[in-house]
Swiss-Prot record:
Protein name per UniProt: Transcription factor MYB29
Gene from which this protein is expressed: MYB29
Tissues in which the UniProt entry reports expression: Expressed in both vegetative and generative organs. Mostly present in seedlings, inflorescences, roots and stems, and, to a lower extent, in leaves (in midvein and trichomes) and siliques.
DNA-binding region: 37-61, 89-112
Region (Disordered): 127-170
Chain's role: Plays a minor rheostat role in aliphatic glucosinolates (GLSs) biosynthesis, mostly short chained. Together with MYB28/HAG1 and MYB76/HAG2, promotes aliphatic glucosinolate biosynthesis but represses indolic glucosinolate biosynthesis. Prevents insect performance (e.g. lepidopteran insect Mamestra brassicae) by promoting glucosinolates.
GO molecular function: DNA-binding transcription factor activity; transcription cis-regulatory region binding
Localization (cell): Nucleus
InterPro entries xref list: Homeodomain-like_sf, Myb_dom, Myb_TF_plants, SANT/Myb
Amino acid sequence: MSRKPCCVGEGLKKGAWTAEEDKKLISYIHEHGEGGWRDIPQKAGLKRCGKSCRLRWANYLKPDIKRGEFSYEEEQIIIMLHASRGNKWSVIARHLPKRTDNEIKNYWNTHLKKLLIDKGIDPVTHKPLAYDSNPDEQSQSGSISPKSLPPSSSKNVPEITSSDETPKYDASLSSKKRCFKRSSSTSKLLNKVAARASSMGTILGASIEGTLISSTPLSSCLNDDFSETSQFQMEEFDPFYQSSEHIIDHMKEDISINNSEYDFSQFLEQFSNNEGEEADNTGGGYNQDLLMSDVSSTSVDEDEMMQNITGWSNYLLDHSDFNYDTSQDYDDKNFI
């Protein structure tokens, strides 16, 4: 069921109230009191709607209404309540005694809204205008890609930093420096090993030519260029450095140029005797009257002797003393 309208629209006056209409309404309410707004227009002799009479009395003609300018405290209360409640003027009017909701609404629209805009505050959200008015600009500025930056600025842009505000690429640079140092020290070590190999080649060549002095030990040649730095590098990069050093010590003790057992001339004589025996079995091919003792060490062809160095190395590897030393070092290594 719909509510019955308070009055019929025919013949009703609209618009501003006159002073005569205000006197009739005030005199009737003083005699009969408030209430019954539907019947008041007929009883008071007014051609107005009952709602219009009620609002005129509540907002203007009521004697306890406070009129005049709003104080600074009242303005602050209205602003704070509007930020939390919005446009609920009747609720705001309850916190301002003797102020009507209609008067508060009119004062907000005519004064307070303009005051907030002048201070740079949005009257709807009560936040700074710069915070809400430029969200698109902030999103565009925050979404600038690194490709749009100039090359000079992109070089100066630091990478992602860690929790202690230090760039992460510092750790990668330090690791690269360590790897470069290790590789450089490794190359130095390999160069020294190559130098040792060349010195061993010169020693064997000198033994073939017979120019090697018998008083020069092999251990002195091995220890000439090994400094403390090379030993430290060997310990750092070779996990079996101690075992290899043990093998070298045994080689120093067991292998000597002065030892007649490892004399290269005897090896050549034995090699020639073996070839002579093979020639006897096969029916010749070599001159049996030729003896190695008749050939001096200085008359031996150097090119042919260098080809037989492989045989000399095989002789060392097949020798019983050398095999015993290497096997003992292998057992010591496994024991460790």
